[in-house]
Every structure is written in C-alpha cells, then in structure tokens.
Amino acid sequence: MLAKDRLEGMSSSTTGGASTAYAAELTFALTLADRADAISLSRYQALDLEITTKPDNTPVTDADKSVEAAIIEAITAQYPNDGIVGEEFGSRGDKNRYWIIDPIDGTKNFLRGVPTWATLIALVENEKVVASVVSSPALYRRWFASKGGGAYVIEGVGLSGTGSDAIKDLAGTAKRKLSVSKVLQIADASIAYSDFQGWGARRASFEKLLDSAWRSRGMGDFWSHMLVAEGAVDVAIEPSLALWDMAALDLIVCEAGGKFTSLDGVDGPFGPNAISSNGLIHAAISAALNGGK
C-alpha cells in the first residue's frame, strides 16, 4: 500500500482522535524529508564540504543549497500553484498557501560535526501552519504534525540511511504521540535557550529567569523546541529567529498541547523571536522576560 493511502486510511484512533484535512500534504512533506536526509547525510562530515559566508555573516554549505534545491524541485512538481519561502533561495509564488524550508537548521553544528541539525519543512495556509516535519537524521529522530491531527515522533530515522520508516510506520505503532509537560511554576521548570547573545534590553531579565528556574541548558535551534513538544523540557526561548527557523516548530509544539509565540506574546512563528512552552507557564515566562525591557 502506498504511503499516501496508508495515511488517508488512518482511523481517528490512530491520529489521536482527530481527523486531518492535510493528510496528503503531511505525507508529501515526509517524502521531502526523506529526500533531504539522503542528501544531508551524504555530506555530513564530508572532507570536501564546501562552505561560504552569506551577507549576514552566517555560513552556508553545499548541503544547504542542495537540500533546498531538491525540495523546491519536488514541491514545484507536486504542487505547482503553491508558493515557496526558502532560507537559501528566497520567496516565490502564492502567499495564501506556501511552503517554508530551512534546509539545514543548525548549519554551524553541521559543518563542525555536531549532530544537532535538522531539515525543517512547513506548509502555511492563510497564515496558519497546517503541516510540518522536522527531520534530524544524525539524531535518528523525525517529528511531524498536521493541523488537528496531533504531533508525533519517529525514533530510529537515519539508521538505514534514509527516513523512509517515518512514512512506512505512520499508521503503525512505531510513532509516538507527543504531549507537553504539566509543570506549573518557573521554579520547577527546565528551560532551554540558544545562547547569551542577542537579548539586548532583555538580557538582565533573561539571566534572572534562568536563575529562577529549576534547570537551564543551552541547547538552541530546533532541538530545544522539540524537547518542549516531547515534554522533556518545559520552555524554550530564543531572542532572534527567522520565519524558516520557526514555522515547522510552531505546529508541532501546539499540536502536542503547548504554546508558541514571540517574546511579546504574539501567537505563531511570524515574529522575530520565540517562546515555546507547555502553555501552563507561558504567561509567566513572557512576563519575566519582558520585566527588564
């Protein structure tokens, strides 16, 4: 049976009790992640990796460009009327329904041989993320969600060289449904952050927040937010992000029962920064970060 048929035939019990109108798009996004993983893994720790510097002084590798180009090619063939927003090759097409691509989130980790990097893929319709995939083959994990369909993780992705098991097992037992934590107070919370740079006027409030938490760790990038979705971390905060850094994360966190906003509390991934949390302590985190502004 084809992956598309398997997903569209899933009962409400296998989708967490909710049907989804975006089953076909989610399955397609998973095939995009398969293609991305095959390219990125083939270039990970490659001795001939090509690295250049973009105008914003951030690095880009030949793997970033190859992954994004492959995803664009596939989207254009499958959904020719959809728009595309990519980190490396810019924007094109429809602004009511478009795909957002971060070919390798964590490029600095990728080029140094640190396994914390991923391909982020999201579909936006009428300014709402409706399907998303975060695939991290070097960590052997893939997270995915569709609007109203819940959020899941497949573990073991990448062990065979591709992520095809995520599709094969989508209607089976290998996927694990995600649910955020139930922590109610900052004093009991585990907080993940990117780094100490970029906080500007919020720097003092940021440091005070970390001091008041039960635990804090500098993880950063997609990894922090996926741990929020898994319930392993209660809060993830980052002071400066682009849309392609956040779009795929937003839906997965929210479908796991959490909340995703800008530091100023605006819902969704369209601000310049992000807080993701279990939702229960979101207001307290936002207030704490804005106290020193």
Language-model regions: role of each:
Residues 65, 69, 88, 103-106, ...:
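Generic detector of well-ordered alpha-helical packing
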Residues 170-174, 178-293:
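An extended, acidic
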Residues 40, 64, 75, 107, ...:
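Residue-level signal for inorganic ion chemistry
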Residues 94-157, 161, 165-168:
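DPxDG-like acidic metal-binding loop motif
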Residues 91-94, 126, 183-185, 268:
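Short, flexible hinge/linker loops that cap or flank conserved catalytic cores
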Residues 1-104, 160, 165, 280-291:
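N-terminal subdomain of lithium-sensitive/metallo-dependent phosphomonoesterases centered on the IMPase/IPPase/PAP
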